[in-house]
């Protein structure tokens, strides 16, 4: 089978299902597992080279609608008559359903079901632990200028709760929210989590926040709780969010959650 993946989260789903050997090309940003870096690239996820995709004669193109603008890819796949599957995850349950849907399409239903069972076990364990925590007020920053942050309709609001926190923009019923720094200050986060999409952690600094007007009004700034996180563990709707959750929870509540490590709970044991 010849598979093309058009975004990083889809590539990661294929890896969990053990089908990377069938992948003949990926988008430019797919970088996990590391072996996908050797695969041919078909362009950025919002500007896929469909001529190249078609030339690869795929048996299945795994597309997504997780980011605005991706619908152009889907329309072009339909126009060219290329066999495709479209995933549109916005919640943690959506991600589990995507695993099942992709597993069915690939004849991997048993493996997908086992992955989903373990996935829900991890979520349930964190949910039980987090229930006794005083929720930390979390401000997630996807992009600094203009400011974009996840709203209540995004998986990071759910992930926040499972780590013993609360997304301060969870009251906004959108997946992505454009806002102003003054609004962030008014909500007074106790932790600021920088996950700038597509930006490496080594290129980021807390100074990007502390230099902003009236930054000291935020509890997170006064207490030094500005955290630079790996965006690939938080901004992609794949089971790798569980690795991000394992890192975030002890950061917020070290007495409740075990120290973080890099192990993936779906790939252990």
Where are these regions (language model features)?
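N-terminal ligand-binding lobe of clamshell/alpha-beta domains
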Residues: 1-269
């Amino acid at each position: 089978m010849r598979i093309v993946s058009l975004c990083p989260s889809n590539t990661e789903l294929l890896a969990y299902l053990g089908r990377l050997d069938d992948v003949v090309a990926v988008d430019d940003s797919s970088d996990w597992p590391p072996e996908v870096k050797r695969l041919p690239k078909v362009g950025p996820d919002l500007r896929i080279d469909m001529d190249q995709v078609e030339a690869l004669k795929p048996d299945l193109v795994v597309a997504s609608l997780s980011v605005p603008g991706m619908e152009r890819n889907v329309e072009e796949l339909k126009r060219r008559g290329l066999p495709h599957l479209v995933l549109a995850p916005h919640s943690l349950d959506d991600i589990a359903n995507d695993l099942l849907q992709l597993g069915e399409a690939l004849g991997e239903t048993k493996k997908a079901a086992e992955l989903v069972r373990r996935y829900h076990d991890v979520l349930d364990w964190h949910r039980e632990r987090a229930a006794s925590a005083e929720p930390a007020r979390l401000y997630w920053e996807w992009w600094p200028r203009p400011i974009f942050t996840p709203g209540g309709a995004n998986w990071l609001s759910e992930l926040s709760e499972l780590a013993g926190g609360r997304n301060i923009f969870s009251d906004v019923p959108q997946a992505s929210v454009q806002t102003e720094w003054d609004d962030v200050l008014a909500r007074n986060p106790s932790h600021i989590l920088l996950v700038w999409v597509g930006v490496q952690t080594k290129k980021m600094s807390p100074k990007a926040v502390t230099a902003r007007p009236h930054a000291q009004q935020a509890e997170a700034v006064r207490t030094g709780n500005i955290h630079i996180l790996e965006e690939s563990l938080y901004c992609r709707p794949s089971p790798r969010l569980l690795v991000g959750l394992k890192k975030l929870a002890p950061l917020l509540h070290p007495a409740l959650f075990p120290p973080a490590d890099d192990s993936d709970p779906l790939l252990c044991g």
